[in-house]
Amino acid sequence: MNNSSTAKARPIKHILIILGRVVVIIAAVLAILAVCIYFMFLRYPNLKADPAVGKWYRVADSAMKDSEGNSYHALFKKGSENKVMIYFAGGGVSINEEMARDDTYNTHMVWPDLLANVTMNMGGLASDVDGSPFEDWTLILFPYATGDFHAGTGEFCYTDTDGKEKILYHNGYNNYTLAMQQIMQKAGIENADTVLVTGYSAGGFATALLSDDIYTNYFPGAENKNVLVDASLLCYSDWHD
């Protein structure tokens, strides 16, 4: 290469270096903005003592986990009225190895929190719609990610489609219990006068299974106790086995 060609190549190389640095800076700025947006708007803060009215929180514990063993959390918003709705999400069920292997249920949480909330409540009882009869109620939401009607306490070993040994964590009842205990300790809602336990699909089965536990252990003094099972149907001929 002669001196003339070398001289022409130097500015191009310099420009490429500058462009590369600009791209790196832009990527870093976008990453920082994404993190800020996530923690400021999309990820709810952890529940604290005496939570603010009308603000969403996540209710987490290290022992809470989804079907794959990853972290799980419930969602909470304190209302201005002395009324509480406990809402169980649906999303399939797993009762044997075939169903565990084929993922016939929600296997993990929807992230981030805001999306999980919107997805769970779109058009539902706990949605933030002006004029809703529940808009000023305290809301306790349980996303579904354990395939056990929110009522499991065990582990199920199975072989997946790739021949790998796996564990399905039926941890729904443990998640529910840990969340309820934390909420009752921090939120100041133990004297609610009206309580509604509800859920749809698989969450409807949770409603039927857990409502007695809720009214016995958490809201025994509520004057108005309600249970609403929504759209829950299970056709399985071997259920009695």
Task: Locate predicted features.
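N-terminal Lys/Arg-rich, disordered targeting/topogenic segments
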Residues: M1-I18
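A domain-start/cap signature at the N-terminus of enzymes
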Residues: I17-I25, V29-E81
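Surface cap/lid and interfacial helix-loop subdomains adjacent to catalytic sites
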Residues: C36-V53, A63, E155-F156, Y169-L196, ...
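Short amphipathic alpha-helical surface micro-motifs
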Residues: K55-Y57, E68-G69, V118-A126, L209-L210
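Active-site machinery of serine-nucleophile hydrolases
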Residues: A63, K77-Q182, K186
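Structural recognition of the beta-strand scaffold that forms the well-ordered cores
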Residues: V84-F88, T138-P143, L196-T198, N226-D230, ...
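Flexible loop/turn segments at secondary-structure boundaries
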Residues: V93-I95, D148-F149, G204-A206, L233-D238
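Glycine-rich nucleophile elbow surrounding the catalytic serine of serine-hydrolase chemistry
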Residues: Y200-L210
